[in-house]
From Swiss-Prot:
Leader peptide range in chain numbering: 1-25
One term under GO cellular component: plant-type vacuole
Biological source species: Delphinium grandiflorum (Siberian larkspur)
Keyword Flavoprotein: no
Protein name: Cyanidin 3-O-glucoside 7-O-glucosyltransferase (acyl-glucose)
Name of the encoding gene: AA7GT
Keywords for the protein's UniProt record, in alphabetical order: Disulfide bond, Glycoprotein, Glycosyltransferase, Signal, Transferase, Vacuole
Length: 505
């Protein structure tokens, strides 16, 4: 058994289904949305992660992370590696210049743990610190607000080998130490910190389905796992993620925040779940799915504990927070980052209750079947509904939409990017509706700034608003029409379809 949503995400990365989404996006209504419709302090930006764009995996003292090792084992569908990626490690000045030309107000990037602490702890690599100092300073020189993510699925392989990474509580202390170094070295210039990217997705992909490294699940699973326990490990990993996040926030608030005056939060993959049918069973199943997928991360942040339905269905396999841990986790955010791409359709699956506990996984504990409907999966109303849900159920926390984007095939046509434009404009319009209805949403980041190494498909899928030619050693960057549209939107210019074209950098 394998979590159906992860299988769906993988399928959505593959070219055949991406083509379906392109056709669907061409049929989207265009939103008449303007930059002036948003509050003046609202930021529009774009994002990437170190793993996906930097390359230079063995230069200047950097050691391997789990993805560097995994990609060399041939696990990617296209057999690609993280070795070079977009080579942003060497080309960050060029990339920041492109951001500035587009008019990005903010850039969300991540810091590579093994570039800062090559051995996971202890020795601080001055070359790694220098790189991020240079990147941050260059962003600020161009008037771009740095939003830094401390961990984006790329912990040191040495810690995975030493004690099993996120399955061990030792990771909490090592992550906190690493975060402390980041705050100390960069916090005087970084205004927005995200501790961990998508812990709910990592816990499922790495420890439930085994789809991403370290590829653990109840053997053999859909991905031929050799070790793991899908009935226990995803919950254990998520528990450690939350405690590590809260521990890092405590360090930041105690030692740095008063002087540095930055904000800190956690990023959550924001599922919007809708019932497959109007039956009572599917409606109740949708409530369960929302609690499991989203409440798993959000409830502890706001209430200090996991959702009641999770405790009922998972039982003793779900770790418990001590009183002190609950107090530490509760309120451990100044904002919540949400990543959102698709609507998930939920169907009740009562037969899962008969699955033996030793064979259970996340799906069977939820007792639902989750799927994405081609043609409906990119419904922009999903983002509006998700933001409304956080407003109504979590006290309307400050939210940044950290990721939202459109995947196209590797061989995308360079003279046609209208599908991505309609996708982005549709979601921006939906987000605006949520803001008008009271959501405290403060920023939007397109995923992604440029085509990159995608964790489920390597270089087979392109999410960037900037095209990267991976077949050319120069890795030539080109602005896609979506970059031009986004630029004109941010700069408050009107653009007709005939005026949009590719431009080379």
């Amino acid at each position: 058994m394998c979590p159906s949503f992860l299988v769906t995400l993988l399928l959505l990365q593959l070219s055949s289904l991406v083509v379906v989404l392109v056709v669907w996006a061409e049929q989207l209504p265009e939103f008449n949305v303007r930059r002036d419709d948003f509050p003046s302090n609202f930021v529009f930006g774009a994002g990437t992660s170190a793993l996906q764009v930097e390359g230079a995996i063995a230069e200047d003292g950097k050691t391997p992370n789990i993805w560097d090792v995994d990609s060399h084992m041939g696990h990617m569908p296209d057999k690609s590696t993280t070795d070079i990626a977009c080579d942003s490690y060497h080309r960050y000045k060029e990339d920041v210049k492109i951001m500035s030309d587009i008019g990005l107000e903010a850039y969300r990037f991540s810091i590579a743990w093994t570039r800062i602490l090559p051995y996971g702890r202890g020795f601080i690599n001055p070359k790694g610190v220098e790189y991020y100092n240079n990147l941050i300073d260059t962003l600020l020189e161009h008037g771009i607000q740095p939003h830094a993510t401390i961990y984006h699925i790329d912990h040191p392989q040495i810690l995975e080998d030493e004690y099993g990474g996120w399955l061990s509580p030792r990771m909490i202390e090592d992550f906190t130490t690493y975060a402390d170094v980041c705050f100390r070295e960069f916090g005087d210039r970084v205004s927005h910190w995200t501790t961990i990217n998508e812990p709910n997705i990592i816990s499922l992909g790495a420890y439930d389905s085994g789809q991403i490294p370290p590829h653990r699940c109840t053997p053999p699973g859909a991905y031929n796992c050799t070790a793991g326990n899908s009935s226990v490990e995803p919950y254990k990993a998520m528990h450690h993620f939350l405690l590590a996040h809260a521990s890092a926030v405590q360090i930041y608030r105690t030692k740095y925040q008063a002087k540095q005056k930055g904000l800190i939060g956690l990023n959550v993959y924001g599922f919007w779940c809708a019932p497959q049918t109007n039956s009572r069973a599917d409606i109740e199943a949708t409530k369960r799915a929302t609690a499991f997928y989203t409440g798993w991360a959000a409830d502890p942040l706001v209430f200090g504990d996991y959702p009641i339905i999770m405790k009922e269905n998972v039982g003793s396999r779900l770790p418990s927070f001590t009183k002190n841990e609950s107090e530490l986790v509760k309120g451990s955010f100044d904002f919540i980052g949400l990543n959102h791409y698709f609507v998930f359709y939920i169907q009740d699956d009562p037969e899962e209750i008969t699955t033996p506990i030793s064979l259970r996984n996340f799906d069977s504990d939820m007792r639902v079947k989750a799927s994405v409907k081609p043609g409906d999966s990119g419904d922009p109303s999903g983002l509006k509904n998700l933001l409304r849900y956080f407003k109504d159920n979590y006290g309307n926390p400050p939210v940044y939409v950290h990721e939202n984007g459109f995947g196209s095939p590797q061989n995308e046509t360079l003279d046609d990017d209208m599908g991505r434009i309609r996708y982005i404009s549709g979601y921006i319009g939906s987000m605006l509706e949520a803001i008008k209805n009271g959501s405290d949403t403060r920023g939007y980041f397109v995923w992604s700034f440029m085509d990159a190494f995608e964790i489920l498909s390597g270089y087979q899928t392109r999410y960037g608003i900037v095209h990267v030619d991976f077949d050319d050693k120069s890795l030539k960057r080109q602005l896609k029409p979506s970059a031009q549209w986004y630029s004109n939107f941010i700069k408050k210019k009107n653009t007709t379809e005939d005026e949009i074209s590719y431009s080379s950098q």
